[in-house]
Amino acid sequence: MKKTDRKKLEKELDKLWSRAVISRDKACRYSNSTDRLSAHHIRSRRHAITRWNLENGLCLAWSVHFLQKANPELFHDRIIEIIGQKEYNRLKKISDQTYKWSLEELERIKEQLLEAINQNG
């Protein structure tokens, strides 16, 4: 698989991950709104090991997600409020590990994300 093919697969996984998070949560985890939903990575997507892990995502209304840029400290506090400090620390510990996914693993992740989307409708 060429590098461009890998990048295409990663982009596809990003979209599937987002759909899977939104289909799982169905509403903003902070406000319970169903208006203008987006999927948010709790730990940045730059951390490869947790980038497509559904535990590292939650559904937020755009108005809540907007706080990430407007007031990062308040936004971080809200994320902790939603998932709890213990869960945040667990995700942080995992995400701090360096990892390079093989192509076979990326294909397996794709299957898992599609399955999650199908299960949650």
Q: How does the language model describe each region?
A:
Residues 2-6, 42-45, 61:
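Short, flexible active-site loops
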Residues 3, 14-18, 24, 67-77:
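Positively charged, helix-rich recognition surfaces that bind polyanionic ligands
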Residues 36, 57-85:
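Short Cys/His-centered divalent metal-binding micro-motifs
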Residues 8, 12, 52, 66:
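A short glycine-/small-residue-rich loop at the edge of a beta-strand within enzyme catalytic domains
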Residues 1-16, 32-33, 90-121:
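A boundary/linker detector
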Residues 29-58, 68:
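Histidine-centered nuclease catalytic patch
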Residues 13-38, 61:
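Short cysteine-rich loop/turn motifs with clustered Cys
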Residues 45-59, 80-93:
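Short microdomains enriched in Cys/His and/or Lys/Arg
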